[in-house]
């Protein structure tokens, strides 16, 4: 074969290979286009499960442990449209308290990523209940948990997570920078109140649906503070109480009316011989009832009730079953402050039913241990110490702490009344235990008109942790 023939032969072979390659590329493009068309046609699949509409997009591997679901729209039997929480229902009749949640945060935090917290509380919208809490900007069993016994620091923040879940960086939502806080839902959005700053000039930052709407400056320049539990929304307006002034003497107490995050009215209570801190508030037939902590001189709890115009009445729970800690043995009550063991105190709550009252309190008279609910059928107005029933929820040998009220509106429960509920903080660590940190978990209960049980639901963590050794 002469050189020209070789050149022609090699060129022909190259041309054939090129044509074959081109055909393969065209086939590949056609195949990809057909495959993409099929996937696009089947990308959205809508299924009905018990009248709940669930839309899945992208790939779902049902027969494997890993499920990749993104861009998911779930409507599970709840109307997600906004409503106005009326707050005009009366409290549901109840016979006792059923366990609602327990997060086991400290137990889980010995090995998992769980926030160091205190002052947890629960608040519900018409769609869900969330646990709010004040973090210390640190995780359990980590070096930054050292010294978290301190109440006020620039690292503290109000965050929230689904009720019953341990508060971690993976399930929690930032709400506000705060070392004192409150939050509530009016049916259209979340109002959060976060207080931060120096003791002599702290500022409360109000947010509505995450956007700053108002600020309130400390007016007495002596540790402005608020409820550490939920505020109350009635017919589109939300209400909260703040305190500014001494913790062991007369201070200043203000009620604020807030609409969509903006203060529309406020009044200062005329209470020269009373002390109101860390109030636990709830709606009842369009009014607001708050039961508070007297840290000055009362071992029974002060209360204030007000309407939407902020016209108020005030007093102390009269019962000889005393609700604060420390406190004397049950005995003769008073409709004013009971001065015996009246100094200091702990956040707590009660629910009024006519002349009767459900009193939540520690089981110990002198330390934050144990927790019980007591029904005194005449305790709101009478001073004797007789009561009808008692339900134990934390044993006296186990640690408790703050407690507070929250309600579930008819728009959430479907009932025709306001369901009363409460939470209990289970404090662990310093100053009572040999750790470098202070944190806690929480339990909660809701009132039911059916059978309940006495038991103890303690924190249950085994201390010290690795970081403490």
From Swiss-Prot:
Record flagged with keyword Disulfide bond: yes
Instruction: Tell me where it resides.
Output: Virion membrane; Host apical cell membrane
Q: What does this protein do?
A: Catalyzes the removal of terminal sialic acid residues from viral and cellular glycoconjugates. Cleaves off the terminal sialic acids on the glycosylated HA during virus budding to facilitate virus release. Additionally helps virus spread through the circulation by further removing sialic acids from the cell surface. These cleavages prevent self-aggregation and ensure the efficient spread of the progeny virus from cell to cell. Otherwise, infection would be limited to one round of replication.
Q: What is its EC number?
A: 3.2.1.18
Which residues does the record give as substrate binding sites?
118, 152, 277-278, 293, 368
Q: Can you say what this protein is called?
A: Neuraminidase
Q: What class of enzyme is it?
A: hydrolase
Q: Which family does it belong to?
A: Belongs to the glycosyl hydrolase 34 family.
Which gene name belongs to this protein? NA
Any one GO cellular component localisation term in the record: host cell plasma membrane
Q: How is it modified after translation?
A: N-glycosylated.
Stated membrane topology is: Single-pass type II membrane protein
Its keywords, alphabetically, are: Calcium, Disulfide bond, Glycoprotein, Glycosidase, Host cell membrane, Host membrane, Hydrolase, Membrane, Metal-binding, Signal-anchor, Transmembrane, Transmembrane helix, Virion
Its domain comment says: Intact N-terminus is essential for virion morphogenesis. Possesses two apical sorting signals, one in the ectodomain, which is likely to be a glycan, and the other in the transmembrane domain. The transmembrane domain also plays a role in lipid raft association.
> By its UniProt entry, which HAMAP family does this protein fall under?
INFV_NRAM
Which cofactors does this gene product need?
Answer: Ca(2+)
Keyword set includes Ribonucleoprotein: no
Q: What is its main location?
A: virion
Q: Name one GO molecular function term.
A: metal ion binding
Q: Could you tell me which residue ranges are on the Intravirion side of the membrane?
A: 1-6
Give me the segments passing through the membrane.
Answer: 7-27
């Amino acid at each position: 074969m002469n050189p020209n023939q070789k050149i022609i032969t090699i060129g022909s072979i190259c041309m054939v290979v090129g044509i074959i390659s081109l055909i393969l590329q065209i086939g590949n493009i056609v195949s990809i286009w057909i495959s993409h068309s099929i996937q696009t046609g089947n990308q959205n699949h809508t299924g009905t499960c018990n009248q709940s509409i669930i839309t899945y997009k992208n790939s779902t591997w049902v027969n494997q442990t890993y499920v990749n679901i993104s861009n998911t729209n779930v409507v599970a039997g709840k109307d997600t449209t906004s409503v106005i929480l009326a707050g005009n229902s009366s409290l549901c009749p109840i016979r006792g308290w059923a366990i609602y949640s327990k997060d086991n945060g400290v137990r889980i935090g010995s090995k998992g990523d769980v926030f160091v917290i205190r002052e947890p509380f629960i608040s519900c919208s018409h769609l869900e209940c969330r646990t709010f809490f004040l973090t210390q900007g640190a995780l359990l069993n980590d070096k930054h948990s050292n010294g978290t016994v301190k109440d006020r620091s620039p690292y503290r923040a109000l965050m929230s997570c689904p009720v019953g879940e341990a508060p971690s960086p993976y399930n929690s939502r930032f709400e506000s920078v705060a070392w004192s806080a409150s939050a509530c839902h009016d049916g259209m959005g979340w109002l959060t109140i976060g207080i931060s700053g120096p003791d002599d000039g702290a500022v409360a930052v109000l947010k509505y649906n995450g956007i700053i709407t108002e600020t309130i400056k400390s007016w007495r320049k002596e540790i402005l503070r608020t409820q550490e539990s939920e505020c109350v929304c009635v017919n589109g307006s939300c209400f909260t109480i703040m305190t500014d002034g001494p913790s062991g003497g007369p201070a200043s107490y203000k009620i604020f009316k807030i609409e969509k995050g903006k203060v529309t009215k406020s009044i200062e209570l005329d209470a020269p011989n009373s002390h109101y801190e860390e109030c636990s508030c709830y709606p009842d037939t369009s009014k607001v009832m708050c039961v508070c902590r007297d840290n000055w001189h009362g071992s029974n709890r002060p209360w204030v009730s007000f309407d939407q115009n902020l016209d108020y009445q005030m007093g102390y729970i009269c019962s000889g079953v005393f609700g604060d800690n420390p406190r004397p043995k049950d005995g003769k009550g008073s409709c004013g402050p009971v001065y015996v063991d009246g100094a200091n105190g702990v956040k707590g709550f009660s629910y009024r039913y006519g002349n009767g009252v459900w009193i939540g309190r520690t089981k110990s008279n002198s330390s934050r241990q144990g927790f019980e609910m007591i029904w005194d059928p005449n305790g709101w107005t009478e001073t004797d110490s007789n009561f009808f029933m008692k339900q134990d929820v934390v044993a006296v040998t186990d640690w408790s702490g703050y407690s507070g009220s929250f309600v579930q509106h008819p728009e959430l429960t479907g009932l025709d009344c306001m369901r009363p509920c409460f939470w209990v903080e289970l404090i662990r660590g310093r100053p009572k235990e040999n750790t470098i940190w202070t944190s806690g978990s929480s339990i909660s209960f809701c009132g039911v008109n059916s059978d309940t049980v006495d038991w103890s639901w303690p924190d249950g963590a085994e201390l010290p942790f690795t970081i403490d050794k």
